[in-house]
């Protein structure tokens, strides 16, 4: 499948590979191994891939036995792999690098040796047990791989043209028109249901069977639960509880994560490491409250107030509708045709969070409450900085609407209070493009262009 990260790999090969290894961080099953091996086949004369989740003891021992003796190391590695490496024209891939930290530590010296290029892939890269006994190399260029974004999904369906036109309309603030807008909304609903996990997308492309798509997604969820049991040492119960309550937390009006849902007497300090583990696994997209809409949102972050979105909305749907009695194909087709009585707001907001993360944004929201002054009660779904920072008006507030009938009371209060700080407010909705009363209204499928 065509992935945008391929261009980043090419840029690294051209400009950085002589001085840095490439580290690709991402959740399990987002396609890290596949895209790296595809890149290796196309762009190098030969390559060796070591999967540390199943590497032999003989391979692992090479890193200890021949550490610092790189001529011997490469000789025995080639003999074990049955692949001839060529200086300046070969790639070595360390897959699931977090499972063998000694290999990651060796990257410093392998890069300095200069004979070959190196790509590492993994998740849980910063968890203490994966880094506690090693010196993390500075010779790493780190990038993220997310689930397939909406445009990549369309490419997989064979549509290479629509997003170019959508992008043009976005730049001109020009509506698509009824027919094309309806087509794009149909595509978006399908993307929301199938999601962006490559296995699920491939299943849809090959079979057009939503039951089989759902089965692929549930297999991924089972894999994530198994990972929690195997690798969240001492945190298994907390991480599992947080993971399983994501749908019910997003179902709430405010969508902020309530620690009380994790059990009586739970305190933030007790679960912070569990939240960190889930974040590092890349299966969730945390969104933190910012106390003011100013440049440097990270400095205004309130870590005690967060929302927790699933990294993939297709997985969220399978997690939320877990009843065995529900036939996936019937459920999904009702969702497709908007004939299911569910909280579409949580699904659409999760979808926008997924789009913004894939576009490179960190996630922030704004929330304010007052018992005495209604004007101080406001919630804004997302805050993102303008592309070009000026002396003021640098933060776009974003509201997400899942239906055609809605009000903008909270957004209006927010804009009025912070009129000297915020840029044009944006509403992502089910309608077409329009600009009205200083508000930019964009269809939901343009969320990834922000």
Task: List each language-model region with its residue ranges.
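Short regulatory helix/loop adjacent to the ATP-binding pocket of P-loop NTPases
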Residues: 109, 126-142, 154-159
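Pre-Walker A adenine-sensing motif
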Residues: 1-16
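Structural recognition of the conserved hydrophobic beta-strand(s) that form the central parallel beta-sheet
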Residues: 93, 117-123, 144, 153
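Conserved lysine of the Walker
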Residues: 32
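Hydrophobic anchor at the beta1->P-loop junction of P-loop NTPases
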Residues: 24
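Interdomain hinge/linker elements that couple catalytic modules in large macromolecular machines
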Residues: 158-348, 354, 362, 368
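Short glycine-rich substrate-engagement loop in P-loop NTPases that contacts/grips substrate
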Residues: 54-88
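A cross-kingdom feature that marks ATP-driven nucleic-acid transaction machinery
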Residues: 13-20, 29, 38, 42-45, ...
